[in-house]
Structure formats: structure tokens, C-alpha cells
């Protein structure tokens, strides 16, 4: 089993992440091509598209943005979650559970797929 950890930017560009917005869709395209080549051998190849997952990186970036915007960290975090239909950040363990599923025998007929773990952040139907 191969599971690529990509980004929601594959389907919906993220502001000011130009490099990520350009490169990650290409990696998922590569993943799809690999799935075509190795699936007959019983190898599955899938990718996870995490949304905004509450990690130290997100917290540190939010602190900097709050300072630059002259607002509290709590206000900045509230502003961020307001853009997510689930109205909360994802947790690292939620992404880990999705990876574990795709790496398991239960996902043996799933290949070439992208799984969004984003609380509804990605607005695309596809």
C-alpha cells in the first residue's frame, strides 16, 4: 500500500502558497499514473488531502497573523475556523486514521483515489 499525504491545495488553491498550489496537483497526477501501473500487482496507491489540521505550524502561523492584524490569537483562530463548514480544525489523529484505513486490507479495492480529510473545506465536487 502506498499513501501520499498531499494537501487540500490539490483541489482548491490556498492563498499565498504558490509553490504548493502548483506542485501538489502534479504529485497526485503522478500517484494516479502509478496506481494504473501497479494495481494489477495488488499494490494500491492513494492520497490524502488534509485541510487545516491544528498543528504547531498552524498555531505559530496564526500567532504571527494575529500580531500583524492586531487581533488576539483566539480571534484569528475563530476567523480561520469560520471558513471551514465543520467550524473546527482537523486533528492529526483524524488524518492518521484515514491513512491507516487506506493502508489496511479494508481498502484493498480502493486505488488511484484522493480522500479529503478537511471538514468540508474543499468546495469542489470532484
Give a label for each model feature.
Residues 14-16, 58-60, 126:
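Conserved catalytic-core motifs of eukaryotic protein kinase domains, centered on the activation segment
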Residues 31-32, 96-99, 103:
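Short-chain dehydrogenase/reductase
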Amino acid at each position: 500500500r502506498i499513501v501520499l499525504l498531499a494537501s487540500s491545495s490539490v483541489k482548491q488553491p490556498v492563498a499565498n502558497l504558490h509553490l504548493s498550489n502548483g506542485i501538489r496537483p502534479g504529485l497526485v497526477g503522478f500517484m494516479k499514473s502509478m496506481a494504473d501501473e501497479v494495481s494489477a500487482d495488488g499494490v494500491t496507491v492513494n492520497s490524502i488531502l488534509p485541510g487545516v489540521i491544528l498543528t504547531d505550524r498552524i498555531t505559530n502561523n496564526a500567532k504571527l497573523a494575529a500580531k500583524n492584524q492586531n487581533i488576539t490569537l483566539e480571534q484569528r483562530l475563530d476567523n480561520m475556523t469560520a471558513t471551514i463548514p465543520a467550524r473546527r480544525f482537523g486533528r492529526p489523529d483524524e488524518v492518521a486514521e484515514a491513512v491507516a484505513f487506506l493502508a489496511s486490507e479494508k481498502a484493498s479495492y480502493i486505488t488511484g483515489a484522493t480522500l479529503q480529510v478537511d471538514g468540508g473545506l474543499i468546495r469542489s465536487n470532484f
